[in-house]
Design a protein with these regions (language model features):
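Active-site-proximal alpha-helix that buttresses catalytic centers in soluble enzyme cores
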Residues: 23-115, 128-130, 134, 139-151, ...
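Bacterial N-terminal signal peptides
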Residues: 6-16
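Positively charged n-region of N-terminal signal peptides that target proteins for export
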Residues: 1-4
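Long, charged/polar, surface-exposed segments that mediate recognition or autoinhibition
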Residues: 125
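Sec/Tat signal peptide C-region and signal peptidase I cleavage site
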Residues: 17-22
Length: 186
């Protein structure tokens, strides 16, 4: 799995360099927030495992040429993104949660405001698939509630009707979705 991760990271870096060469090609990296505490239920912070995953994300993307970081207003997305944003000296751009499709389109608009750059989006298990679809990526099933290690990479080119998607992982492995959430994305 480590080898696969580094191959994907190499692709991200290469795509970032390509994005610089092609003025409007945008690399979008999407992750679900890291592991969250059980309370408070409405807006929990990260657990110790989540804090470790947020640091792993910062390490994994340190050389990926990220130029913008988009989160929701919820603590768990902001805490997941903050180590990378702080390391790169980038502000966290907030897109408020709301109805799924409306939120996904708002995130897609925020990404498009950074055309030609590499953008990190930290979302939720129920918003990441919608955001990918809003950016013309392929549709897929829900992300299992126990899955935190997925890393999705989209290469968005102006005029393309469909956007390619690479799925990888980072940090500690999540439990096997086949046993914890049958029928969801693995």
């Amino acid at each position: 799995m480590t080898r696969r991760f580094f191959l994907v990271l190499l692709c991200i870096i290469a795509a970032g360099a390509q994005a610089s060469a092609q003025a409007k090609t945008t690399v979008v990296i999407l992750v679900r927030h890291a592991e969250k505490a059980a309370a408070p239920a409405a807006d929990p912070p990260l657990t110790e495992a989540g804090v470790a995953r947020a640091r792993a994300l910062a390490t994994a993307l340190a050389d990926a040429n990220v130029r913008a970081v988009i989160t929701t207003e919820l603590i768990r997305t902001r805490e997941t993104a903050r180590p990378l944003a702080d390391a790169l000296g980038l502000p966290l751009e907030t897109v408020h949660t709301g109805t799924g499709g409306v939120h996904a389109r708002a995130v897609a608009d925020a990404v498009r405001a950074h055309a030609g750059q590499t953008v990190l989006v930290v979302g939720h298990s129920n918003t990441i698939p919608l955001i990918i679809a809003a950016l013309s990526g392929p549709k897929f099933g829900d992300i299992c509630d126990t899955q935190y290690s997925n890393l999705f990479v989209l290469i968005v080119r102006p005029g393309d009707k469909k956007t390619g998607l690479v799925v990888s992982s980072y940090g500690a492995p999540s439990p096997d979705a086949a046993t914890t959430c049958p029928g969801s994305m693995k």
